[in-house]
Curated annotation (Swiss-Prot):
Keyword set, alphabetical order: ATP-binding, Cell shape, Cell wall biogenesis/degradation, Cytoplasm, Ligase, Magnesium, Manganese, Metal-binding, Nucleotide-binding, Peptidoglycan synthesis
Ranges of residues in domain ATP-grasp: 101-303
GO MF terms, alphabetically ordered: ATP binding; D-alanine-D-alanine ligase activity; metal ion binding
Protein name as annotated: D-alanine--D-alanine ligase
Enzyme Commission number, as recorded: 6.3.2.4
Cofactor(s) required, per the database record: Mg(2+); Mn(2+)
UniProt source species: Yersinia pestis
Keyword flag RNA-binding: no
Amino acid sequence: MAEKVAVLLGGTSAEREVSLLSGQAVLAGLKEAGIDAYGVDTKDFPVTQLKEQGFDKVFIALHGRGGEDGTLQGVLEFLQLPYTGSGVMASALTMDKLRTKLVWQALGLPISPYVALNRQQFETLSPEELVACVAKLGLPLIVKPSHEGSSVGMSKVDHASELQKALVEAFQHDSDVLIEKWLSGPEFTVAILGDEVLPSIRIQPPGVFYDYDAKYLSDKTQYFCPSGLSDESEQQLAALALQAYHALDCSGWGRVDVMQDRDGHFYLLEVNTSPGMTSHSLVPMAARQYGLSFSQLVARILMLAD
């Protein structure tokens, strides 16, 4: 009998709208590949009932909290339902940008200099103390919530007077915030499928950085795949991405985001364990360059589910 596959989409995180788009695309791709797949919006459907509804396998197309932070993965482990992407620990770890950095730092992998602040510290420090706290990083800075995806709550800080406002914005989304040294070079992303590294993509957003609008709404964001790197740099980037991915115990598929500075050095940003699969998304773009159609890509991801 053919496997019955649930494509989990929507959900309740700040990335719900993106997840709905990803899920519908995945669903169409799986059906095109001849797979018996059904869309399930977890906002309306309790995942604990998946097995009794006859589902044999789960394709996770949820983004953000509750979908790629280990919570859902734990439920699916308990239900003994195979699912796409990373397991509980890797999903939880990669959703936490601070702890991801701590692991990479311990292994000597390149990351941008940063300062971490929690809400209590933020509320007790004066504006002058905050500025002193990040003085060692130098301006400009990027401020981001530790647990949000899709660039939600992120701000660039060009002047010390802007730091307070950027932190207030970030703390609206999280109780832990990262302040990082701004890297002015290009951004790259590297998709990983199983243990295969797909061609890198160079991202050129229309604005200051690759924010939510640039990722999902703008038609002015430019993507270059092949990325234009030399063969040597492409191999170096691929090796770094795979090392960073395995350091966090990721599996199945994912995407590693990287910045390059003016001297050509790469710095790790984060890993996405349930990347976007919309018309603007990067993994399908890299897969096309690799020779995989969208339906072949989603079928391969599903095949890697365990």
